[in-house]
A protein has these predicted regions:
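Nucleotide and nucleotide-moiety/phosphate-recognizing core
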Residues: 2-134, 164-170
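A conserved catalytic-core signature of glycosyltransferases
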Residues: 133-135, 140, 156, 172
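Nucleotide phosphate-binding site architecture
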Residues: 16, 26, 145-146, 184
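Short, surface-exposed amphipathic charged segments that create phosphate/polyanion-binding patches used
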Residues: 85-88, 142, 180-185
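Short aromatic/basic micro-patch
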Residues: 110, 139, 176-177
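Conserved nucleotide-sugar donor-binding
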Residues: 135-146, 180
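Glycine- and other small-residue-rich loops at beta-strand/loop junctions that grip anionic moieties
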Residues: 104, 137, 175
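Conserved alpha/beta core of the MobA/IspD/sugar-nucleotide pyrophosphorylase nucleotidyltransferase superfamily
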Residues: 2-4, 146, 150-203
Length: 203
């Protein structure tokens, strides 16, 4: 089966050592970030969404949107590219030809469906940019996907893929949830972030 629509991956297999708690379960408006990411990808038109997590977190993810699949990375310590490879291999079991995949790390939540739509309207691999700063999610085309699949699991994605920078209207794009201080920043801005998530998104 081949999908003309993009496919989505949410990466949340990291061990969250610096934050001290699971990033995927951080809530905005009472909804975990992993759920927000899945919703945004589905609203953007992704034909399938897969969450890549670790064994410990898998049983604590709770209810995800209908149709979202979950796969476990047995070696999350190998980093983001390893998790991306786990997700891609899972997608390959259902879609033998991967044309375009949207990859969203759960700890970079400052985007919504409109950002994905803008990215997939371009050809090739792309990443969003707001006020000169690049962010996530990113879109990988078939050539980039092959590079990722053939790379060591600890390789840096920026060394594997040449992303086209695409301007987007995403004031929260640089938001990162990696440390307690960054989580505190999210809490201070939670109401505004929730308004951004839900404005015009049909949620």
């Amino acid at each position: 089966m081949t999908s003309k629509a993009p496919l989505g991956l949410v990466l949340c297999a990291g061990l969250s050592k610096r934050l001290g708690s699971a990033k995927a379960l951080v809530e905005v408006g009472g909804v975990p970030l992993v759920v927000w990411a899945c919703r945004h990808l589905l609203d953007a038109g992704c034909a399938a969404v897969v969450v890549v997590t670790n064994e410990q977190l898998r049983s604590n993810l709770g209810a995800l949107p209908n149709g979202v699949q979950v796969v476990t990375n047995p070696e999350p310590e190998n980093g983001r590219t390893g998790s991306l490879q786990v997700g891609l291999n899972h997608l390959l079991s259902q879609f033998p030809v991967l044309k375009r995949v949207v990859m969203a790390p759960v700890d970079r939540p400052g985007w919504r469906a409109g950002v994905v739509r803008t990215l997939v309207a371009k050809t090739g691999s792309s990443c969003p940019v707001f006020e000169g700063r690049r962010g996530h999610p990113v879109v990988l085309d078939n050539e980039a996907l092959q590079s990722v699949l053939n790379a060591p699991s600890d390789a840096s994605l920026r060394d594997l893929v040449d992303f086209q920078a695409v301007e987007v209207d995403a004031p929260w794009l640089s938001l990162n949830i990696d440390t307690p201080e960054q989580l505190s920043e999210l809490r201070r801005n939670e109401e505004a972030l929730l308004a951004y998530f839900t404005q015009g998104e049909g949620i």
